């Protein structure tokens, strides 16, 4: 049986053989120690393979209480630790009130250096919510700020603002959001794929099929790899 640590090392060696690139890893506080992966070697490799393939994104679904979130978090932490995944990982846990703009806000704020430097003062002045997100792109000057109205944040605008970000956005408990939000996220995934963005999306949710998690979006299937998680075999529980 492959050990928890060796599967990441094995995958790293495999990727290094395929493409000789400089991999980097910036240590930070772990999201989740990769200790929940016993018996999940195949799923871990599928996730890693998908998230390191150009234009591909990933979705984990299955019944409640089988370890979907733990698998996602532990795989991302292990992959980051070994340098096969980006060092910047954003985790959004949804609830019934979560909107598309809420999901996009975390990575958007991360790339907005001006907002990050003044977020306390800005938030205080703006009250409960900000009217705009000021997003910077590396290919435009500081004066050419892209202003995105939060109430009119479309998938195409979000993709344009974030497509150069080398990171992973984990959207957990995705099943509870509205169909409109699911459709917007699916369209966002498609546009990221079309633009060959290094920003990767990992969706996690309770479902018996992948289609319901993306509200039946017709053209996202080609770029969204589905992993249906089943209950772990008894032999791995002891």
Functional labels for PLM-detected ranges:
Residues 27, 84-86, 218-219:
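Surface-exposed beta-strand-to-loop junctions
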Residues 2-7, 154-157, 163, 238:
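C-terminal alpha-helical "lid" subdomain
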Residues 1-58, 77-81:
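A short, basic N-terminal segment
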Residues 49-183, 197-200, 205-209:
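P-loop NTPase nucleotide-binding core
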Residues 6-9, 168, 180-238:
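The catalytic "switch" region of P-loop NTPases
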Residues 32, 87-89, 224:
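Short, solvent-exposed beta-strand edge segments and adjacent coil->beta transition regions
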């Amino acid at each position: 049986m492959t050990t928890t640590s060796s599967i990441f090392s094995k995958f790293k060696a495999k990727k290094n053989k395929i493409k000789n690139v400089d991999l980097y890893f910036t240590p930070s506080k772990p999201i989740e120690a990769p200790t929940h992966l016993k018996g999940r070697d195949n799923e871990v490799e599928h996730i890693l393979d998908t998230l390191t393939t150009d234009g591909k994104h990933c979705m984990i679904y299955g019944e409640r209480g089988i370890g979907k979130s733990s698998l996602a978090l532990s795989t991302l932490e292990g992959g980051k630790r070994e340098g096969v995944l980006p060092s910047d990982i954003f985790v959004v846990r949804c609830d019934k009130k979560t909107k598309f703009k809420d999901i996009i806000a975390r990575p958007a704020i991360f790339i907005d250096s001006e907002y990050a430097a003044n977020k306390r003062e800005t938030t205080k002045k703006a009250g409960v919510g900000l009217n705009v997100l000021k997003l910077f792109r590396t290919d435009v000057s500081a004066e050419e700020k892209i202003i995105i109205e939060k109430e009119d944040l479309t998938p195409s605008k979000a993709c344009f603002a974030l497509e150069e970000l080398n990171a992973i956005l984990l959207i957990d408990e995705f099943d509870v959001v509205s169909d409109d939000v699911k459709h917007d996220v699916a369209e966002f995934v498609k546009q990221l794929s079309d633009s060959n963005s290094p920003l990767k999306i990992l969706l996690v949710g309770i479902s018996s099929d992948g289609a319901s998690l993306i509200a039946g979006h017709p053209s996202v299937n080609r770029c969204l790899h589905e992993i249906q998680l089943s209950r772990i075999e008894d032999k791995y529980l002891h």
